[in-house]
A protein has these predicted regions:
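Receiver (REC) domain active-site loop signature in two-component systems and cognate sites
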Residues: 58
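Short, glycine/charged-rich "phosphate-handling" switch motifs in NTP-dependent
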Residues: 102
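C-terminal output helix
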Residues: 109-118
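Two-component/phosphorelay signaling modules centered on CheY-like receiver
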Residues: 13-32
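Short, conserved "switch-loop" micro-motifs in signal-transduction and mechanochemical regulators
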Residues: 87-88
Length: 131
């Protein structure tokens, strides 16, 4: 049964595949992936994910700009966003949080613990579906 919708936004096909496979092992997760910030804005508004995993460095529209646009739309403003990035120095993480992200997951990540990490950022009502 899939109750938890995760939208992954990353321009790297390999990252999208690893996240999809890792979260797909848990039957409670349904995932969709986008390769750009522009696609993410449309998909998030239409699909209403439980959480968005958002790459920081993407061409055309980077993660922080995508987050700002998500926050401007009443249909997506409430969706928790977690940045997925290799840029995890304290000052950068502080900046991401100040922009409205709920947290940061560092690349590279451990595919075996990704589901648990994602669950830790879910709103309590959503996470309570977890075993």
């Amino acid at each position: 049964m899939t109750d938890i919708r995760i939208l992954l936004v990353d321009d790297e096909p390999d990252i999208r595949e690893v996240v999809d496979v890792s979260l797909g092992l848990d039957r409670e997760f349904a995932t969709r992936a986008c390769a750009s910030g522009a696609d993410a804005l449309v998909t998030a508004a239409e699909w209403s994910p439980s959480l968005i995993l958002l790459d920081v460095m993407m061409p055309l529209m980077d993660g922080p700009t995508t987050l700002a646009n998500l926050r401007k739309n009443p249909r997506t403003a409430h969706i928790p966003v977690v940045f997925l990035t290799a840029r995890t120095q304290a000052s950068e993480v502080e900046q991401y949080i100040s922009l409205g992200a709920q947290g940061v997951l560092s690349k590279p990540f451990d595919p075996m613990t990704l589901a648990a990490s994602v669950r830790s950022y879910l709103p309590p009502a959503t996470a309570s579906h977890a075993p």
